[in-house]
Swiss-Prot record:
Catalysed reactions listed for this entry: sulfate + ATP + H(+) = adenosine 5'-phosphosulfate + diphosphate
Membership in a protein family: Belongs to the PAPS reductase family. CysD subfamily.
Name this protein carries in UniProt: Sulfate adenylyltransferase subunit 2
Pathway(s) it belongs to: Sulfur metabolism; hydrogen sulfide biosynthesis; sulfite from sulfate: step 1/3
Lineage start: Bacteria, Pseudomonadati, Pseudomonadota, Gammaproteobacteria, Enterobacterales
UniProt keyword annotation of Transferase present: yes
Enzyme class, spelled out: transferase
SUPFAM superfamilies documented for this protein: Adenine nucleotide alpha hydrolases-like (SSF52402)
Annotated function: With CysN forms the ATP sulfurylase (ATPS) that catalyzes the adenylation of sulfate producing adenosine 5'-phosphosulfate (APS) and diphosphate, the first enzymatic step in sulfur assimilation pathway. APS synthesis involves the formation of a high-energy phosphoric-sulfuric acid anhydride bond driven by GTP hydrolysis by CysN coupled to ATP hydrolysis by CysD.
GO molecular function (one): ATP binding
InterPro entries: PAPS_reduct_dom, Rossmann-like_a/b/a_fold, SO4_adenylTrfase_ssu, Sulfate_adenylyltrnsfr_sub2
Entry's EC annotation: 2.7.7.4
Matches recorded under NCBIfam families: CysD, PRK05253.1, PRK12563.1
Length: 302
């Protein structure tokens, strides 16, 4: 890695650590949202650096849908134990009672009930006034215009027309009772930055990011990995083995794999250098309707 690139990554690292420390000092009850993906792994690594040699001064929160990949659950539990992190797991009990299923109810309803409502329930339950998230501006257009300190009203809603200025790395965290801030320390990182930093810092990631033969079924132009026996095969669908990996991770029935031979981090970085598509193309929830991500964020989504 050349010196300019290394300096760029260290500048991003310093900015993110500064933001994380600012939140810890400014807010009374912060939490780090931990979705188990590559961005969460980088964000957790930065947080551990920010407070080393001490422990994290806030817990991790995983909003569980019951439909994550099995390897994600294993990685989550191993990581929390290895780093001595307090891990809070919340699953929407109302959604569980309703039997919400992405195959039956679709991506929009599943995401709204199990993710958006589940997140709001957890934030209310524990009274968190700030929540770190791993979103980046290069991922999607609504995230591109969101501030690092993203103000949310008492219903956890985001108003893109009512955002606060952030000049010269000054962040306004003033809130009234019931309001909160979503904080995005990785806002200025790109997908390539993330992968190069993971390689540089030797950060552990879920093995699903690396290519290997996996059972998949093609549906709506996406390759869905068959992770357990809850798969709902449609007429004419056949499970086949393909060499695939994931650029983004979510609920397995709603996350598409990509055909790839990249079995190592350097190989992934090579792919990123020539990629012309967003990693979010593998998320079915982004295809619900035009502007679906912004609509979800207005309703309280991550």
């Amino acid at each position: 890695m050349d010196e300019k690139r290394l300096t760029h990554l260290r500048q991003l690292e310093a900015e993110s650590i500064h933001i994380i420390r600012e939140v810890a000092a400014e807010f009374g009850n912060p939490v780090m949202l931990y979705s188990i993906g590559k961005d969460s792994s980088v964000m957790l690594h930065l947080a551990r650096k920010a407070f080393f040699p001490g422990n994290l001064p806030f817990p991790l929160l995983h909003v569980d849908t019951g439909w994550k990949f099995r390897e994600m659950y294993e990685f989550r539990d191993h990581t929390a134990k290895a780093f001595g992190c307090e891990l809070l797991v919340h699953r929407n009990p109302e959604g569980v009672a309703m039997g919400i299923n992405p195959f039956v109810h679709g991506s929009a309803k599943h995401t709204d009930i199990m993710k958006t409502e589940g997140l709001k329930q957890a934030l209310n339950k524990y009274g968190f006034d700030a929540a770190f998230g791993g979103a980046r501006r290069d991922e999607e257009k609504s995230r591109a215009k969101e501030r690092i300190y993203s103000f949310r009203d008492r219903f956890h809603r985001w108003d893109p027309k009512n955002q606060r200025p952030e000049l010269w790395h000054n962040y306004n965290g003033q809130i009234n009772k019931g309001e909160s801030i979503r904080v995005f320390p990785l806002s200025n990182w790109t997908e390539l930055d993330i992968w190069q930093y993971i390689f540089l810092e030797k950060i552990d990631i879920v093995p699903l990011y690396l290519a290997k033969p996996r059972p998949v079924v093609e549906r709506d132009g996406m390759l869905l990995m068959v992770d357990d026996d809850r798969i709902d095969l449609q007429p004419g669908e056949v499970i086949t083995q393909k060499m695939v990996r994931f650029r983004t991770l979510g609920c397995w029935p709603l996350t598409g794999a990509v055909e790839s031979e990249a079995q190592t981090l350097p190989a992934i970085i090579e792919e990123m250098l020539i990629s012309t598509t967003s990693e979010r193309q593998g998320r079915m929830i982004d295809r619900d309707q035009s502007g679906s991500m912004e609509l979800k964020k207005r309703q309280g989504y991550f």
